[in-house]
Amino acid sequence: MFATRSFCLSSSLFRPAAQLLRPAGRSTLRNVWRRSIATEHLTQTEANSRLASQRVHRPNSPHLTIYEPQLTWYLSSLHRITGCVVAGTLYAFAMGYLVAPLAGYSLDTATISGLIQQVPTWIKVPAKFVISYPLTFHIFNGIRHLIWDTTKELSLKGVYRTGYAVLALSVLTSGYFAMI
């Protein structure tokens, strides 16, 4: 009630509208800085050189080298890389399987097992590890992501714990597959 009463008794309400607008209009128009717009016609090379000189003075964004590498970076990039490697290998083998008969080659299981039997064991074991590691890592890290989708293990400690578990399980299962 008091706020309404003091508002009604304000002296500015009793002035005519022309008096209220006149002083404000005069002072703001006097203080406005007017600048004419200058344009110039540039050739393409002049425009490119001006743009290049402006780019020199722009601030650079931070590079990845200023950040401390973390396990989560490595596992995320390795998950993407192994996904591409596994999918690329699958597609390459499928295309080879389809195109081989057209080129006069046989790419059936008997031929592949015959070729693998000719390879010495000291080459087969590391080769099987190298072949199986991307697949096992991608599978276990995919399971890790599915666990995260259930909102479990999302703490910093849980993320690192599951990351080390994925690495250990991938190495162990790849080693097992290499020894078979």
UniProtKB/Swiss-Prot annotation:
Residues 1-82, 144-159 are mitochondrial matrix. It is found in: Mitochondrion inner membrane. The chain crosses the membrane at residues 83-103, 123-143, 160-180. The keyword Transport applies. The keyword Cell cycle does not apply. GO terms for molecular function: electron transfer activity; metal ion binding; protein-membrane adaptor activity. GO terms for cellular component: mitochondrial inner membrane; mitochondrion; respiratory chain complex II (succinate dehydrogenase). Its cofactor is heme. The heme is bound between the two transmembrane subunits. Pathway: Carbohydrate metabolism; tricarboxylic acid cycle. Heme binds at H138. Gene3D superfamilies: Fumarate reductase/succinate dehydrogenase, transmembrane subunit (1.20.1300.10). InterPro entries: SQR/QFR_C/D, Succ_DH_cytb556, SuccDH_FuR_B_TM-su. It is a multi-pass membrane protein. PANTHER family: SUCCINATE DEHYDROGENASE CYTOCHROME B560 SUBUNIT, SUCCINATE DEHYDROGENASE CYTOCHROME B560 SUBUNIT, MITOCHONDRIAL. Belongs to the cytochrome b560 family. This is Succinate dehydrogenase cytochrome B subunit, mitochondrial. It comes from Schizosaccharomyces pombe (strain 972 / ATCC 24843) (Fission yeast).
